[in-house]
Regions:
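N-terminal Rossmann-like FAD-binding beta1-loop-alpha1 element of flavoenzymes
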Residues: 5-32, 411
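Glycine-rich FAD pyrophosphate-binding loop
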Residues: 24-48
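Glycine-rich active-site loop/strand segments that organize a redox cofactor
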Residues: 43-62, 124-136
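Short beta-strand to alpha-helix junction loop
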Residues: 58-65, 141-142, 153, 189-211, ...
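Mobile amphipathic helical/loop "lid" adjacent to a hydrophobic cofactor/ligand pocket
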Residues: 64-68, 72, 76-177
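Helical element adjacent to the flavin cofactor pocket in flavoenzyme catalytic cores
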Residues: 184-232, 241-244
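Mid-domain catalytic core of redox enzymes
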Residues: 226-334, 338-343
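Conserved flavin/dinucleotide-binding core of flavoenzymes
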Residues: 308-416
């Protein structure tokens, strides 16, 4: 590896890996500097006693256009959630069936308590409209809070509260539905066009696959960048590195610090993982908190989706709480188990806590107006570029697209 590569990339998250890989494929020499002890950024998987613990509940939407272009889905061995969801309200579990992807389910879908017939017809209308819209069209539409968009579609208060609030709360980390309506429409389009999956070896398999095509020695771990000046980076230990181009692919807060921008607002989330002897729900399905009571927003038995997430004879339960609570793990865990006992009975008392993750900066906030323009500038000043989901949209697709745009800008400039 040359001591002076053409490009230094700061951050081995999805955006940085996407950028570096595409530059390498064009014959540009690169080196990635990663502050932590591993690649993936926020998309990492820990191994604990035979369990696979993603750092927060995460999924891959197979319809993501850039993921389809850059990732090899068969090699990821993707395992799919069932289409639809369960939602707890009115003292019981209620099933929302996706009749478009579940053969023979139209009767069940129309007869379920999940919204009125009018609500279901409006979901069909929304689904058709978004499937007929390109992602570029969606991100150029007038922006407003998601709750306003749902109300303007004519959805009832009941289905907004029981379905859209916890579903979008889990995806956009926004239980109040204040996030950009552009993000809501993009997410709903992706849900309508593809599956929701996890790789059999954990979400961390995604960055590993991106990194596999990079040259040996091109990723340097535990290399925190403290400052940049023109075409030079200074590491935490005082070492200086130079390159023809610098790509800042760090998280939004770190990137803002390095390039002198205002720190972007972000959303936080908490995830608790439990080990269980038996699955409380023997289905590979997402479970939503439709009545809003208690801390848990969404829940799943992740080993029902991907059995490899748990050792033989055990099951892995993932519980998502929006925000990072001031409570201790013991206190919050007590409230979680109390809520789960209400849903599933005393069996929840036997669950064993494996680990909790409190992620203060899980996603860019992206309120209405934050996605204007839909793609923020990549080229900050001559020789310095910034990429990440905070430059596009809060999704795996946004991170990958941003990395691609950075690679294209760098290659164009270096080729002049």
């Amino acid at each position: 590896m040359s001591s002076s590569p053409d490009v230094l990339v700061v951050g081995a998250g999805l955006a940085g890996l996407s950028c570096a890989r595409q530059l390498h494929e064009k014959g540009v020499s690169i080196q990635i500097l990663e502050a932590s002890d591993g690649i993936g950024g926020r998309v990492r998987t820990d191994h604990l006693h035979g369990f696979l613990l993603d750092r927060g509940f995460q999924v891959l939407f197979t319809a993501y256009p850039e993921a389809q272009r850059l990732l090899n889905y068969p090699l990821l061995d993707l395992r799919s959630f069932a289409h639809g969801a369960l939602s707890w309200f009115a003292g019981g579990m209620n099933k929302l069936v996706d009749p478009w992807r579940t053969p023979g389910s139209w009767k069940d879908a129309l007869q379920s308590d999940f919204g009125s017939l009018t609500d279901k017809l409006r979901i069909a209308r929304l689904r058709r409209r978004l499937r007929n819209s390109s992602t570029d069209e969606i991100f150029c539409r007038p922006d407003r809070p998601t709750k306003d968009a749902l109300q303007s579609e004519g959805f009832s208060k009941e289905i907004i509260h029981r379905f859209f609030r916890p579903l979008l709360g889990g995806i956009l980390l926004d239980g109040k539905l204040n996030a950009s309506s552009r993000m809501f429409e993009f997410v709903f389009k992706m849900l309508s066009e593809g599956s929701v999956c996890v790789p059999s070896h954990g979400m961390g398999a995604i960055p590993i696959q991106l990194a596999e095509k990079l040259p040996a020695g091109s990723i340097r771990l535990n290399a925190r960048v403290d400052a940049l000046h023109e075409n030079e980076l200074t590491l935490a230990g005082g070492e200086s590195l130079r390159a023809r181009a610098l790509v800042i692919a760090a998280d939004g807060l770190s990137a803002a610090h390095l390039v002198g921008e205002v720190e972007p607002a972000s959303r936080s989330v908490t995830c608790f993982y439990y080990s269980a002897q038996e699955p409380p729900v023997p289905l590979p399905i997402l479970i939503l908190n439709g009545d809003g009571a208690g801390p848990v927003n969404n829940f799943c038995v992740i080993s029902q989706i991907a059995p490899s997430y748990a050792p033989q004879g055990k099951h892995l339960i993932s519980v998502t709480v929006l925000g990072t609570q001031a409570l201790t793990d013991v206190q919050l865990g007590g409230f979680i188990i109390a809520q789960m006992k209400n849903w599933f009975g005393k069996v929840a008392s036997s669950w064993q806590l494996l680990r909790s993750y409190r992620i203060a900066h899980a996603q860019p906030q992206q309120l209405p107006g934050a996605l204007e323009p839909p793609q923020r500038p990549i080229r900050i000043r001559p020789g310095i570029y910034v990429c990440g989901d905070h430059r596009a949209n809060a999704s795996i697709n946004g991170a990958l697209v941003s990395g691609t745009r950075a690679a294209e800008a760098v290659y164009s400039d270096l080729s002049r």
